Amino acid sequence: MPSSAQNVGIKALEIYFPSRYVPQTELETFLGASAGKYTIGLGQQNMSFCDDREDLYSLALTAVSSLLRKYAIDPNTIGRLEVGTETLLDKAKSCKTVLMQLFGDNTDIEGVDTYNACYGGTNALFNAVNWIESSSWDGRDAIVVAGDIALYETPAARPTGGAGCVAMLIGPDAPLVLEPVRGSCMKHVYDFYKAYFKSEYPLVDGQFSNTCYLGALDACYQRYQAKQRARQAAKTNGTAISNGHQGSFLDTFDYFAFHAPNCKLVAKGYGRLLFNDFKLESGSFDEVPAQVREADFAASLTDKALEKLCVSLTKERFVQRVEPSLTAPTNCGNMYTASVYAGLISLISNVPSDRLQDKRIGMFSYGSGLASTLFSFRVKGDTTEMARKIGLQDRLSARTAVSPEFYDQMCKLREKAYQQRNYTPEGSVESLAPGTYFLVHVDDAYRRKYDMKPYLSMCEDRHEQAV
């Protein structure tokens, strides 16, 4: 039996996003929106998308095969594989079983799929960590996959789409250690759901969903704080805070990554944390603004003036602690389950390893319906090699911009392909980056066949074969 695992967390990270994107400035014009509505109003710059050549399975195959290749991971060292997604292609067969093709003769791998809107990846992460910390652990590592394609039918929601997949190697002695405290909020609401099975488009109440997100954040933050204080673990990091405030619970987090339906909502969410501190620990501040002091918690969720005030009061901290996590979200759009982990990848790509050591990274994961958790990582190892292997900025820069008209055509192509059998995709293989898996054909029995676009070098990897 292996000895008890210590410092369990993320040992390696990989991200995949499609090779083409549509600029949000051009989408504003195409959809008849005012200039800046998407870029300033939503905080989005570009949006990734897929044609009918890519789907959840291809995204996950690409991300996991790349993780195995870049980090030279022996498939036999993996004992658990979990997938979090809401982009379902089959109501019975899991995406995890499709990924088993990458693991050769190693069929002794636990785990399946988890789904609840954008939250499934986080639940998969917790499952993997709990397995490694349990008496059932056999000494091997786990891989967690979070990936989705976000696509909306109505013009108002179109700019909040996106696509991407994150693969994480989970194990002991990790540089990103999952801390034990977390606060969760689970409720029954209909803010966003996919009950109409004849379309991949969701049913959405956008404003209500934003309110649900912020209300869940309140509850998770308060519960995390209460549990952390109960463990006598909460302490400030000694960082000077603007507006003369220092010592609030918000300052126990050196950095923060949020689930990002859009980056403007992230800024509102971060401001909301300070509002909670003002209300719940007013003694930590020299002065609490009257507008905050008099606000009711429930009514404050839709108070735009209060929202602006809190965003303004946290602006300096936001730039230092949260903005580094927004590179992928603002350039790729909403990746649903992968979103918060794309934020984590952005953070370690933008902040040098030496500045991250022993820092706490707050994480807020939200999935409509709803399921949410606020948790944290403590950095206890070098992240330099991880950031180098990811190569986030270079890969973002290597993408190709397309027109909104072309994007609209690809949306129609996906509509045509949805739930079809005897179907051969029409999308371009040439546009895909080397190492990308793509759909070749769906046969008469709905069985899907994939292949991989080869790397430019002649070197072949044993994990990357036609499947």
Curated annotation (Swiss-Prot):
Xref: CDD domains: init_cond_enzymes
Reactions that this protein is recorded to catalyse: acetoacetyl-CoA + acetyl-CoA + H2O = (3S)-3-hydroxy-3-methylglutaryl-CoA + CoA + H(+)
Listed PANTHER family: 3-HYDROXY-3-METHYLGLUTARYL COENZYME A SYNTHASE, HYDROXYMETHYLGLUTARYL-COA SYNTHASE
Keywords: Acyltransferase, Lipid biosynthesis, Lipid metabolism, Steroid biosynthesis, Steroid metabolism, Sterol biosynthesis, Sterol metabolism, Transferase
Annotated organism of origin: Aspergillus fumigatus (strain ATCC MYA-4609 / CBS 101355 / FGSC A1100 / Af293) (Neosartorya fumigata)
UniProt-recorded Gene Ontology molecular function terms: hydroxymethylglutaryl-CoA synthase activity
Protein's UniProt keywords contain Transport: no
Entry's family note: Belongs to the thiolase-like superfamily. HMG-CoA synthase family.
EC number(s) per entry: 2.3.3.10
Active site: 86, 118, 259
Pathway: Metabolic intermediate biosynthesis; (R)-mevalonate biosynthesis; (R)-mevalonate from acetyl-CoA: step 2/3
SUPFAM superfamilies tied to this protein: Thiolase-like
Entry's Gene Ontology BP terms: acetyl-CoA metabolic process; ergosterol biosynthetic process; farnesyl diphosphate biosynthetic process, mevalonate pathway
Binding site for (3S)-3-hydroxy-3-methylglutaryl-CoA: 35, 118, 160, 209, 259, 268, 334, 368
The protein, known as: Hydroxymethylglutaryl-CoA synthase erg13A
Record carries keyword Ribonucleoprotein: no
Function noted in UniProt: Hydroxymethylglutaryl-CoA synthase; part of the first module of ergosterol biosynthesis pathway that includes the early steps of the pathway, conserved across all eukaryotes, and which results in the formation of mevalonate from acetyl-coenzyme A (acetyl-CoA). Erg13A and erg13B condense acetyl-CoA with acetoacetyl-CoA to form hydroxymethylglutaryl-CoA (HMG-CoA). The first module starts with the action of the cytosolic acetyl-CoA acetyltransferase erg10B that catalyzes the formation of acetoacetyl-CoA.
